[in-house]
């Protein structure tokens, strides 16, 4: 007669099963099906899952997940978003945004889909606003015990001062609430900062973060935030490095609870990875300090970002090795590839499938979190 495992050990094993396989286990027994709906198990599973990359092609609007196996081989899957919206066929043509395993997918006519690729038929369709937005972000009010997801729509134009220079941003801001299923407009005055790149907006503990630069201070860089609980933009902290011309500076989430910045010098191609010393709680009064996690100084190491391309690298640190850097970027010909870096060695891995040059990509952590569809 087979030996029954203790329930605690059974749960611990299931926490380490990849989401795609885990969703197939729902029918094994009633307890497992109930377990996969338990919020504590879902959150613990999200903390254990290995990050991967999501890549979106421009021409045919295809979306791929790219996982890195233990032996450094790539596991590539095409993710089939249900492309029939309520009124028309959806063509995802812009940047994707991530939160809690959800992908926010802006479409050609500003219709928006929020989608969990690992939970079949888990797509929420959102009607567009009249205003076109430069960027979106997905988060939630972190002061509430339950997560009430919200979407930020942020558009802007430049406003000229008396001297004729364009040194202020005139924002157009709206927030969509899943709870009310409606957009509402927010009013702000002129901003004295602009986004370094609208392609990189992070969601951490419900709050949005991105790199911004001051309009009038020679381009000083800092991290700007949007707090969904207060529906306010606020400067969060300074960058750990200077914002010199041509430098690559990429903001990512580290280990699910901290911020990380990758800096690459354009002349030496030397890389520094910085992480916040403490967990990011979202408290606007918290003091943020940085530590240097690793330095990469390898002869003939490539430049990760082309100076004249909008394509930015995305990266994460290996879950089991703080000194193992995994980067998704494009090579000098614009072809997407993966670099795995540790110590004084690096490995380049080609994707193995054909896409047009300079596709968009981002770091993604799969999850079992269901989308609130009501």
Swiss-Prot record:
InterPro entries: F-box-assoc_dom_typ1, F-box-assoc_interact_dom, F-box-like_dom_sf, F-box_dom, SCF_F-box_component
Superkingdom of origin: Eukaryota
Protein name (database record): Putative F-box protein At3g16590
Domain F-box intervals: 1-45
Taxonomic lineage of the native organism: Eukaryota, Viridiplantae, Streptophyta, Embryophyta, Tracheophyta
UniProt xrefs under Pfam families: F-box, FBA_1
CDD domains named among the record's database cross-references: F-box_AtFBW1-like (cd22157)
């Amino acid at each position: 007669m087979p030996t029954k495992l203790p329930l605690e050990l059974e749960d611990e094993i299931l926490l380490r099963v990849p989401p795609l396989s885990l969703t197939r286990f729902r029918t094994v027994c009633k307890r497992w099906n109930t377990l996969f709906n338990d919020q504590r198990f879902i959150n613990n599973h999200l903390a254990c899952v290995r990050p991967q990359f999501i890549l979106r092609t421009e021409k045919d609007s295809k979306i791929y997940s790219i996982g890195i196996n233990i032996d450094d081989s790539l596991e590539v899957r095409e993710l089939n978003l249900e492309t029939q919206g309520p009124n028309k066929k959806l063509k995802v043509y812009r940047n994707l945004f991530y939160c809690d395993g959800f992908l926010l997918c802006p479409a050609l006519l500003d219709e928006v889909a929020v989608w969990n690729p690992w939970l079949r038929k888990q797509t929420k369709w959102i009607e567009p606003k009249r205003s076109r937005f430069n960027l979106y972000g997905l988060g939630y009010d972190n002061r509430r015990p339950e997560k009430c997801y919200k979407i930020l729509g942020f558009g802007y134009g430049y406003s000229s001062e008396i001297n004729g220079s364009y040194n202020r941003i005139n924002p157009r801001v709206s927030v969509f609430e899943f709870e009310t299923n409606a957009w509402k407009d927010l009013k702000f005055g002129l901003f004295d900062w602009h986004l370094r790149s609208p392609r990189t907006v992070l969601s951490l503990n419900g709050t949005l973060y991105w790199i911004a630069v001051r309009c009038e201070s020679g381009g000083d860089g800092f991290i700007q935030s949007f707090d969904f609980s207060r529906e306010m933009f606020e400067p969060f902290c300074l960058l750990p490095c200077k914002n010199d011309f041509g430098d690559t500076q990429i903001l990512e989430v580290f280990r699910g609870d901290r911020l990380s910045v990758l800096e690459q010098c354009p002349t030496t191609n030397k890389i520094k990875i910085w992480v916040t010393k403490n967990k990011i709680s979202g408290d606007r009064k918290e003091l943020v300090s940085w530590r240097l996690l690793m330095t990469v100084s390898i002869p003939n190491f490539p430049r990760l970002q082309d100076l004249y391309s909008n394509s930015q690298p995305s990266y994460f640190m290996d879950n089991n090795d703080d000194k193992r850097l995994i980067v998704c970027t494009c090579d000098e010909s614009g072809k997407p590839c993966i670099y795995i870096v540790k110590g004084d060695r690096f490995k380049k891995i080609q994707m193995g499938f054909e896409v047009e040059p300079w596709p968009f990509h981002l770091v993604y952590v799969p999850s079992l979190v269901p989308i609130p569809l009501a």
